Amino acid sequence: EKIRDCINSVLWADEIIVFDSGSTDRTVELAKKYTDKVYVTDWPGYGPQKQRALEKAVKDWVLSIDADEQVTPELRVEIDTCLEDDPKAIAFRIPWAVHIFGKRLDFGRSGRAPLRLFKREGARFSDAQVHEKIILPSGKIGKLEGRLLHFSHRNMLQALEKFIQYSWLWAQQRHEKGEKTGIANALLHSCWEFFNIYVFRLGFLDGRRGLLMAILFWQYTFNKYASLWSLNIPVKK
């Protein structure tokens, strides 16, 4: 749905690599208009899929973005500058500018700055099914000022479906590692997530959408831990 805008925002890159996991829209067709490095594979999870893409890269630096994200012209200039001016850095965090239901949020979830720009050598993605991490060798990690646009939720149905999928994947992943939790713990974590987004990260300054985002993540966090709890309930025959 947003692949064209995503790729257009990074056309200045020396190489563009696109991985598709069997989408049924025109994603592959559109992507091939911009790069010949388009790969269609199965879906092993977010971490393994991004590791596959990383292994195809040949340039020194990698910018990892999802199809619902875009690089602003200002961020592009800053990226070019920082790679020249800070030779000791091995990676950079980039602040998000989350868009929800057609409006940008400047606080709350937009207060996060995920690690997205990094040196390829020695880097790898974790094997997490969801909420994957970039694992780096020791070194300096900087933070940019420009924002990475993130069009995360186009409507309420899409947001709820995404949160349900992510919470279940997270629970399965933790269950496989032998982790356990309880309903009280689910409530504690979800309340903390709400206050973290709405109060500590100033989500209340984003108005009604800021409140809605905090509530959605309260629900999402509760569902994660409640799902993990449910997976550990003995099945009675």
Residue spans of the language-model regions?
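Alpha/beta-hydrolase active-site loop signature
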Residues: 23, 44-45, 69
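Short, structured coil segments at secondary-structure junctions
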Residues: 12, 33-34, 113, 137
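A conserved acidic beta->alpha catalytic loop
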Residues: 9, 20-29, 66
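Conserved donor nucleotide-binding strand/loop of the catalytic core
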Residues: 28-58
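Catalytic-site signature of metal-activated, phosphate-bearing donor transferases
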Residues: 48-54, 61, 65, 72-237
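Hydrophobic/aromatic residues located in beta-strands of well-ordered beta-sheets
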Residues: 15-16, 141
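Short, well-formed alpha-helical segments that are part of the catalytic scaffolds
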Residues: 1-12
